[in-house]
Structure formats: C-alpha cells, structure tokens
C-alpha cells in the first residue's frame, strides 16, 4: 500500500478545521491545540517562512507549509497525535492483511533533516513489525546514492534507487561501458 505521510489534501477535514479555527483568531492571538487539536497536525506559522508557505484560506495572519503544492499541506510528523493517527492507519491495513508499505516522499517529512526523517520512518516501521513480524517497508528517497544510503539508518529494509536506472545512472553506465564492476560498486554503497 502506498502511504503518503508527508501531506494531506487541502480538503481533508483536519486541515479545513484547522484553517477555519486559525481564520477565526484575533490578530496576535496564538492558536490553542486544546481548542482545535488539528492546528498541531500541520506546519502553521504567523509569517510566510519561504516559497513553500501559503496563506491560510480566510486569514491574512496565518500561513502553512506545502512543499509540493498549495493543495497538499505538509503534516507535522513530530506531533504525537499525528504519529498516533498513522499508527491507526497501519493497524487498519495490517488487520486487513497488508504486509508492506511504500513510504511516499520520505525525505520530505521534515525538510533537510535526514536524522529526523529516519526517526519517523523507524518509529512507524518498528510499530508495524511489532504487529506483523513479516512486515516490509520500502521508502521513496528521490536523491543521490549517498543520501539514500543515509536513510538506511532508519532501519527500513529497502529504498528506491531511482538514479540507478536513469540515463546516466549506474545500471545504464554499466551496460554502456560493459563494466559490471561499476554497478556492483554502486550497489555496495548501500551495503556499507
């Protein structure tokens, strides 16, 4: 099953309720997650922190992060409540007999934070393995081989190696040059 933990739809009830709540705050008033727990589910800010931050609908005082697009707000995966939500998602699918997840956009959970992303992956993978010892996880980390190799610290058993199959990737280069040793050396980077 493909699991998109990085973001939700801008139409998701968590996001729409959080936006309605923020739009109703008075200028300078801080959000209270005991009043609206969903304000902690996303990366909201009272200032536009970069080009991936968009105005909260109905508010000129609040912004949210959407790394891929304004219609896909980023979830706050450091939030224990969000982590619990994904444990419930895992429970649902594992109880139905699913024995593996493809983790979408794993390197974007927290931007430029490999260690934090590895912790997030490890926590969910460990949870799933406790539910099903045969559980398998593969993570999408669309990056260089060196960055992908760093993500193995998460304990996740497999990462996609998109670069290996590109026109200039290790697989194509090995075939073009008749040099299988270069392919083996490229793959060994993941082992070490």
Which residue stretches match the model-derived regions?
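Conserved alpha/beta catalytic core and glycan-binding cleft of carbohydrate-active enzymes
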Residues: 10-11, 16-23, 27-47, 125-126, ...
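Short secondary-structure capping/turn micro-motifs that flank functional sites
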Residues: 7-9, 109-110
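Asparagine-centered polar/low-complexity signal
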Residues: 6-7, 76, 161
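Active-site-adjacent "subsite" loops/lids of carbohydrate-active enzymes
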Residues: 11-96, 106
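Active-site neighborhood of glycoside hydrolase catalytic domains
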Residues: 71-146
